[in-house]
Design a protein with these regions (language model features):
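Short terminal or interdomain "cap/linker" segment that borders an active site or interface and mediates
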Residues: 155-232
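Intrinsically disordered or highly flexible coil/loop and linker segments, enriched in small
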Residues: 55-66, 141-142, 153-158, 229, ...
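Short cysteine/histidine-rich metal-coordination sites, predominantly Zn2+-binding motifs
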Residues: 236-237
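Short secondary-structure transition/capping segments
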Residues: 106-107, 150, 204-208
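Internal, well-folded beta-alpha domain core
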Residues: 121-181
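Structural signal for hydrophobic packing residues in well-ordered secondary-structure cores
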Residues: 50-57, 148, 152, 224-227
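Active-site helix-to-loop segments that bind/position phosphate- or nucleotide-bearing substrates
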Residues: 2-126
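Conserved active-site and cofactor/substrate-binding residues in soluble primary-metabolism enzymes
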Residues: 41-44, 48, 135, 139, ...
Length: 237
């Protein structure tokens, strides 16, 4: 049970693969289908790959809860750490007085499975694998957020959406600051010199907590990150 008056210890959970809710619309979007549905043979291939992943992946997440605040229009402070979170995220989290700092991962099993596909030189499966991994990583975060929100609301508090370095004008290099809240190789995740995570389908980020915190729509219409696949303003169907 989360209690923000506690000593801010680390919470850790392994997620049964069956608890992950696969967002098919998001999957097809990442695969380039927009709002269309792939042909039946491709859907059958996706289903087969999900069965394979259920046998080899161990999704998990861990997080800490720390006090924090908005410092100015572009910076948040969590404990003693100052984040260059940018205007979009800072504004969205302006009411938060505590923050969840998290790491979530599909696990090393995905990387081993994905390497085998690459070695087999199956371009279709390789393409599907990358999209599946991304959706599974988001599903891990969704499970975590749902559980956190349920417990936080019992205390009369609310949570924000999740925000991660590399999105919404928050520099990717800021992941180093988030990882500093955890022991090395926490959840089996390493951060490379270029601030990429290993296993590859892993996510780090923050969630705001507070009595007046709201879940706001992601501000894709004002984000300057034109290469982001999430940026709906760049999608044409």
């Amino acid at each position: 049970m989360i209690n923000i008056s506690d000593n801010y210890g680390i919470f850790h959970t392994i997620i049964p693969f069956g608890d992950l809710k696969i967002d098919r619309q998001e999957l097809y979007l990442l695969m380039g289908y927009g709002h269309q549905v792939p042909d039946k043979p491709y859907i059958e291939q996706i289903d087969k790959m999900l069965d394979e992943l259920a046998d080899c992946c161990t999704p998990e997440y861990g997080y800490v809860v720390q006090p924090g605040k908005r410092l100015n229009s572009e910076n948040l402070q969590i404990a003693e750490t100052i984040l260059q979170s940018g205007k979009i995220i800072t504004s969205s989290l302006r009411e938060a007085d505590h923050f969840v700092v998290f790491i979530a991962t599909v696990g090393k099993g995905f990387d081993a499975w994905n390497r085998k596909i690459q070695q087999d030189d199956d371009m279709v499966r390789a393409f599907f694998a990358d999209s599946l991994g991304s959706v599974l990583a988001e599903a891990c975060v969704a499970v975590m957020q749902e559980r956190i929100e349920r417990e936080i609301m019992e205390q009369g508090l609310f949570v924000s959406n999740c925000y991660s370095p590399g999105y919404c004008d928050w520099p990717l290099v800021e992941q180093k600051k988030l990882f500093a809240f955890f022991p090395e190789q926490y959840c089996g995740v390493n951060l490379t010199e270029s601030c990429l995570m290993v296993p590859i389908k892993s996510v780090s980020g923050i969630i705001g907590i507070g009595r007046n915190v709201k879940k706001r729509l992601y501000s894709c219409e004002v984000c300057t990150m034109t290469t982001c696949v999430k940026n709906r303003k760049n999608l044409t169907f």
